Each structure stands twice: as structure tokens, then as C-alpha cells.
Regions:
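Walker A (P-loop) phosphate-binding motif
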Residues: 1-34
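ATP-dependent small-molecule kinase phosphotransfer cores
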Residues: 37-108
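An amphipathic alpha-helix signature
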Residues: 47, 51, 136-141, 151, ...
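Generic C-terminal helix-cap and adjacent flexible tail
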Residues: 193-201
Length: 201
């Protein structure tokens, strides 16, 4: 069975820089967000579940899900958020487990990019976990710039998630992305070669 490494981070922490680099190096990277996106396409498992739960109002004219509306329905209501975490979470876990088992047959090392890796107890799946970390003020600034948000909105969305500080204590390796892309990639190369990344505090 192959070595499995979990990669996680936070909004705008720079996780995609790491996963894109790994793919360029020829590694297989399972993208949990892409798996969810696929499951939410018309007719697929999450699509059916969500329409059954929220009704026709979440379907656009072209048959796709109205993702912004869905996000606001789920994130504005703690009960809906809990429902989503449990029900969608179970289906997502099944799909990711199937992909993991499939790749473990053929790959010596592969990666799984899971945004809620620690929050949803995926840690036990992995031989190592890598956290892409940035300081909070850098994260807010990058998030505002990336999604054209006000500081207030960016702060409130980040507040709804576990902080990167909290995740830092749980990860086996921390990739510091407060600097440039090249500095981040250099840390990834070091880990691939078997060294540690930046020093853990």
C-alpha cells in the first residue's frame, strides 16, 4: 500500500500552489473540492440529497445547483450547517475512501487535498499531514483580494472556520506561505526529499 499524505490549509492560505506543484512533479493529488463539485452535478448523489432537503428553489434554470444560494442557506444557519456536515459529509467520505483505496493499489506516494481534514477527522487516513500556513493578517488580505470582499466579510467567513493556528498543532509538517511562491515550493521539495519543512515552533 502506498504512502498517503494529507494536505490542508485555510481559505487563501495557498494550498493550490502546493497541489499544482505536486501535480507538475507527476504525483497524483485527489482534490476533495473537485469530488464534491462532481457529486453536486445534476443527477449525482449530493445533488439529489440537497434538492430533496432544500427543494426546487436551489436549482438554476440550466438545472445546475445555485451554489451561492446554497452556501448562504447552509452557512447562515447552524442547524443546516450541522445537517450538511453530517449528511453530505458521509457521502463525501465514502467517495474519497474509494479513491484512496484505488490509488493505494498503484501509487507509491499520493496526496489528498482535504480542506476540512482536521475538522472532519480524516487525520487517521494519512501517514503524514501537511498544513499550508499563513499569518491571519496575510490570510485576510489575500482572501479580500482574491474574492473581492470587504474586510468585514472576509473576517466573518474566516471566523466560521478553525484557525490555522489551531491546525498548526495537529499537522505533522507546516509549510509557511508568508513569503513568495518560490519559498513555499522550496519547502515542498525539502519534504519530498525527506527533510522537514520550516522549523516548527
Amino acid at each position: 500500500m502506498g504512502k498517503i499524505i494529507g494536505i490542508t490549509g485555510g481559505i487563501a492560505s495557498g494550498k493550490s500552489t502546493v497541489t499544482n506543484f505536486l501535480r507538475e512533479q507527476g504525483f497524483q493529488v485527489v482534490d476533495a473540492d473537485a469530488v464534491v463539485h462532481q457529486l453536486q452535478k445534476p443527477g449525482n448523489r449530493l445533488y439529489q440529497l440537497l434538492v430533496q432537503h432544500f427543494g426546487q428553489k436551489i436549482i438554476l434554470e440550466n438545472g445546475e445547483l445555485n451554489r451561492p444560494l446554497l452556501a448562504s442557506l447552509i452557512f447562515s444557519n447552524p442547524e443546516e450547517r450541522e445537517w450538511s456536515k453530517q449528511t453530505q459529509g458521509e457521502i463525501i467520505r465514502e467517495e474519497l475512501a474509494a479513491l484512496r483505496d484505488q490509488l493505494a493499489q498503484t501509487e507509491t506516494v499520493f496526496f489528498m487535498d482535504i480542506p476540512l481534514l482536521f475538522e472532519q477527522d480524516y487525520s487517521a487516513w494519512f501517514d503524514e499531514t501537511w498544513l499550508v500556513y499563513v499569518d491571519r493578517d496575510v490570510q485576510v488580505e489575500r482572501f479580500m483580494k482574491r474574492d473581492h470582499l470587504s474586510k468585514e466579510v472576509a473576517e466573518s467567513r474566516l471566523a466560521a472556520q478553525w484557525s490555522l493556528e489551531k491546525k498548526k498543532d495537529l499537522a505533522s509538517h507546516v509549510l509557511d506561505n508568508n513569503g513568495s511562491r518560490d519559498q513555499l515550493v522550496a519547502q515542498v521539495v525539502k519534504l519530498l526529499e525527506g527533510g522537514d519543512s520550516c522549523a516548527r515552533d
